[in-house]
Amino acid sequence: MCTTCGCGEGNLYIEGDEHNPHSAFRSAPFAPAARPKMKITGIKAPEFTPSQTEEGDLHYGHGEAGTHAPGMSQRRMLEVEIDVLDKNNRLAERNRARFAARKQLVLNLVSSPGSGKTTLLTETLMRLKDSVPCAVIEGDQQTVNDAARIRATGTPAIQVNTGKGCHLDAQMIADAAPRLPLDDNGILFIENVGNLVCPASFDLGEKHKVAVLSVTEGEDKPLKYPHMFAAASLMLLNKVDLLPYLNFDVEKCIACAREVNPEIEIILISATSGEGMDQWLNWLETQRCA
């Protein structure tokens, strides 16, 4: 996971940086990361043997760090992870205090790529725009495509490109949020990078993580990526308008999610048909008033 692999060291870009004369992105915000030639040297890796099932399957998450990186001991990975997450969590608490002072509801939308969360978000914003002030932070590795889609609804949005990074972190939110015009008592939606692994570990200062799972992904996704669904308060089972065309067991999916997180709330939803949208909007209003 990225708390130990260092993927957060990629080229970060937040919309507006290109106008800063001191920004490396002033002339080319989407320049690919440099690929310098690297000298490969031999590394004597600490001994680590993955667990093995009777069928021969290998499991690299059984060590004390819960993961594996070549050339790094389990104890060192734990030290790196604790250091990274401690810094992030302190920043997240500052973000949370700022949002709470303005009574803003902040939600961290997480999912696999292609789950439909941007389409669901645009439909949500269209339904809220005359009643609730909203703003959006869009996270992707590259492009401002999704932020442009959000702005087309009339909602303020800012794109955060993580470069090689596979998730948003609390510092990115601290940098991006002040650039958005969001009134007190409004809702800030943070659409995280499409990834069901690393975003689970990084607190952004949100009130809730909302996991979006598409019915095209398979019923057992919560069991395959348990950390994300354990961290989420709500699961939106998306694209249910496609159920007549799929061999997807809704009850099995719900059971898998609740096996990982017995307290998780679940809404069946479709931005295309409108099913579940009222329930989703009611949930948002309940959280705003909580």
Swiss-Prot record:
Sequence segments annotated as region (G-domain): 106-267
Binding, Ni(2+) 2: 166-167, 198
Pfam families: cobW (PF02492)
UniProt keyword annotations, A-Z: GTP-binding, Hydrolase, Metal-binding, Nickel, Nucleotide-binding, Zinc
Entry-linked InterPro entries: CobW/HypB/UreG_nucleotide-bd, Hyd_mat_HypB, P-loop_NTPase
Swiss-Prot/TrEMBL GO biological process terms: protein maturation; protein-containing complex assembly
Binding-site positions, Zn(2+): 166-167, 198
GO molecular function: GTP binding; GTPase activity; guanosine tetraphosphate binding; metallochaperone activity; nickel cation binding; protein homodimerization activity; zinc ion binding
Binding sites annotated in the UniProt record for Ni(2+) 1: 2, 5, 7
Effect in UniProt of substituting residue 5 to A: Decreases nickel content. Disruption of the N-terminal metal-binding site
Any one annotated GO CC term: GTPase complex
Domain notes: The N-terminal region contains a high-affinity nickel-binding site and the C-terminal G-domain contains a low-affinity metal-binding site, which is not selective for nickel and could possibly accommodate other divalent metals. Both metal sites are critical for the maturation of the hydrogenases.
Subunit structure: Monomer. Can form homodimers, but dimerization does not have a critical role in the hydrogenase maturation pathway. Forms complexes with HypA and SlyD.
Function comment: Involved in the maturation of [NiFe] hydrogenases. Required for nickel insertion into the metal center of the hydrogenase. Exhibits a low intrinsic GTPase activity, which is essential for nickel insertion. In the presence of GDP, nickel, but not zinc, is transferred from the HypB GTPase domain (G-domain) to HypA.
Family of this protein: Belongs to the SIMIBI class G3E GTPase family. HypB/HupM subfamily.
Name of the protein in question: Hydrogenase maturation factor HypB
Originating organism: Escherichia coli (strain K12)
